[in-house]
Amino acid sequence: MRSDMIKKGFDKAPHRSLLKATGLKDEDFHKPFVAICNSFIEIIPGHKHLNEFGRLVKEAVRAAGMVPFEFNTIGVDDGIAMGHIGMRYSLPSREIIADSVETVVNAHWFDGMICIPNCDKITPGMMMAAMRINIPTVFVSGGPMAAGKTSKGEVVDLSSVFEGVGAYQSGKISEEELKDIEDHGCPSCGSCSGMFTANSMNCLCEVLGLALPGNGSILATDSRREQLIQRAAESLKILMERDIKPRDIVTEEAIDDAFALDMAMGGSTNTVLHTLAIAQEAGLDYDMNRIDAVSRKVPHLCKVSPASNWHMEDIDRAGGMSAILKELSRKEGVLHFDRITVTGKTLRENIADAEIQDKEVIHSLENPHSQEGGLRILKGNLAKDGAVIKSGATEVKRFEGPCVIFNSQDEALAGIMLGKVKKGDVVVIRYEGPRGGPGMPEMLAPTSAIAGMGLGADVALLTDGRFSGASRGISVGHISPEAAAGGEIALLQQGDIVCIDVEERLLEVKVSDEELAKRRKEWKRPEPKVKTGWLGRYAQMVTSANTGAVLKMQNFD
C-alpha cells in the first residue's frame, strides 16, 4: 500500500505514535488510508451541509474496511463575491484548492481519496488535484438546491434575483417584488438550481467517469445522496483493488464525452475553462479546436435555467445525465462507450437502463433545440485564440453594432445603470482577463442588468473576462488573447462596428488589418491593477483562457 511509507517498519515508530494520537489502533495499520477531501464552509449555501456529508462518508469508508482522514479546502462563493474585489479571488482559488489537496494527500501518502466538492471553483480545483496526485479517487458532490417560488407562485432562482436588480432599477418591478424574489431565490442548501457553473461541473464530473451516476442532478436534500455516499466508498475500494486511477479514467475520449454532454445540455461557458485546465493536469493535449469539433456534431437537447424555466430537479426527474447520454448514444460517432469509470464499469454499462422520462425537459434527437451544441467557440480578428458563447441561452444568432467600451466591470455596470448603453450596442468590457483582472472575474452583474432592463436580445456583451453560468443573452467571453496580453480586444475604439455570427462562429471588428497594426504600435500596456499578495503573483504566472488559465511553470532547462 502507498501508505506503508508512513506506517510500516521499525523506523516508522514515530509516525505510528503520532497516528495513534489521532485514535488509530494497531490493526488500523494493515488497512488502506483514505483521504476525505471535504469543502465544508458555512458562508457558501452549496457547502453548509457538507460537514454532515463528511461524517457519512467516513462511516461508509470505515464500513468498507478502510481508515478515513478528513480535511477541508478553502472556497469562494461566486454569488457573494460578485461585484467587488472578492470576485478577483474566485478563479485563483481554484489553483489554491488544487495545490492544497495535492499538499495534504502527498505529504501523508494516502492510498485513495474521496472528494466532496459542490460549487464553482471547488469541483474543478479538486479534479485538477486528482489528476496530479493520480491515486484511486471518487467524487461525490453536495448536490443542487431546489428552485424557489415567490409568494405569487413564480419559480425563481439566483439568476432571477440578479435580474431583479436590473428590473427594479429600470422601474419594471417594485421594491416589495424584488424583496419577494430575494427571499425565495435560494430556498435551501445546495449548489444554485440552474445549469450554472457548479451544476455544470458536477454533471461533467459524472460523465468524465470520476463520479457515480446521479452525482450531477440528485438534489442536496434528497435521501438518494446518502446512497451515493455509500456507493462511493464501495467504488473506491474496487478502484484500489484494481489500481484504477484518475488518469486511467480521464482520457481524451472521456473529455470528448464530457463536452458532448455539455453541448447537449447547454452548460456554463466556464466548463470550457475548467476542463481545459483539468486536461492539462492530466497531461493531455486538448484544445478549443477539439471542443468546437464536438459542438458541431452534438445536438442541443435540453435547456435549463437561465435558458429556460427548467431546473436541476426537472433534469433529475427526466432521467438525469444518464438519460441525456443514452439519447446521444443513438447518434453514431458521438460517445465512446467502452471507457472505464469509477463504477468499475464502462460508460455503456452505466447508461444501459437509462431512458428519458419527460421529453419536454430532455428532447429527443428528432426534436432538438438545435442541431449543434449549446456552447460554441468563436474565432476571428477579435479572438485569434478563441472565445466562447453560450449559444443555447440566446435566440439571436447574428448581431452587429457599434461598440461601447469599458475598461473594467465596475465602469461598465455604472455606465449601464446610467443609461450609456442603448439598443443595438455591443458592450465591451476589457482588461478583465486572467492577467488583467486579475482573476478573470465573472460578468453576471452587467449581463443581469442588461437583461433586467429588457435589453437582453438587443445588446451584446464581449469580454476577456468570464460569465457566470447564470448569465444569458448575447454574451461572448474568454476572448483570447486577453487585453492585458495585447490581444486585439485592447485595440478596439469607441464606435467600431463589431460582428458576432454564432452560426459561422465568427467574432470580428470591421477594421482593416492595417488599421489594427497601426493601433498596436500606439498601444501601451496598462500598469497591473494589483502588484502584491496572492493576486499579484497570480497575475504574473497565469496563462490565457484558451489554455485553461492555469499557472505557467518556470522553465528550468
Swiss-Prot record:
Organism of derivation = Bacillus cytotoxicus (strain DSM 22905 / CIP 110041 / 391-98 / NVH 391-98)
**EC code:** 4.2.1.9
Q: What is this protein called?
A: Dihydroxy-acid dehydratase
- List ligand-binding residues for [2Fe-2S] cluster: C119, C192
PROSITE patterns, alphabetically? ILVD_EDD_1, ILVD_EDD_2
Which terms under GO biological process does the entry name?
A: isoleucine biosynthetic process; L-valine biosynthetic process
Family to which this protein belongs:
Belongs to the IlvD/Edd family.
User: What residues form the catalytic site here?
Assistant: S468 (proton acceptor)
Gene3D superfamilies per record: IlvD/EDD C-terminal domain-like
